[in-house]
Amino acid sequence: MGSVNSRGHKAQVVMLGLDCAGKTTILYKLKGNRLVDTLPTVGFNVEPLEAPGHVSLTLWDIGGQTQLRATWKDYLEGIDLLVYVLDSTDEARLPEAVAELEEVLEDPNMAGVPFLVLANKQEAPDALPLLEIRNRLDLERFQDHCWELRACSALTGQGLQEARQSLLHLLRS
């Protein structure tokens, strides 16, 4: 898709993660800083987002239910960045989330594509600490990708400004 250093660039960003991770809530918080009632996404949501530096983003929020994950690969061709959302409170499903991320990153369309992992729901008292999530994900093994890991809360908005900055940084890398 090209470098984001050029003026007027349009970047395609795909957001994936297991069901109930908070992808749709994050999408609409980033879009208008508003909290919306959500239902499980069947298919996808897509929203434009203007970013500093004359960058227009198109954010694709793809449903994360088990039966929809087989379609994830259909959204990877030509993307500029992957955002992968984890539910920090769902320790039982963390291995499943890691396995799905690995599968996505192994797709040939993902060669060299940077990714941002958002550890969502950090406001919850039972949320796993970011360092523990980092250790379990072992992201350093993905040497063919630029990546960042950020803690956030879609509910409170905590960490979403930093997530947006990371997103733009990765697009420029």
Swiss-Prot record:
The lipid modification N-myristoyl glycine is placed on: 2
The molecular function terms in GO held by this entry are: GTP binding; GTPase activity
A single Gene Ontology biological process assigned to it is: hematopoietic progenitor cell differentiation
The positions annotated for binding GTP are 17-24, 61-65, 120-123
The UniProt function text for this chain reads:
May play a role in apoptosis. May act as a tumor suppressor.
Family under the similarity heading: Belongs to the small GTPase superfamily. Arf family.
Please identify the protein, giving its name as recorded. ADP-ribosylation factor-like protein 11
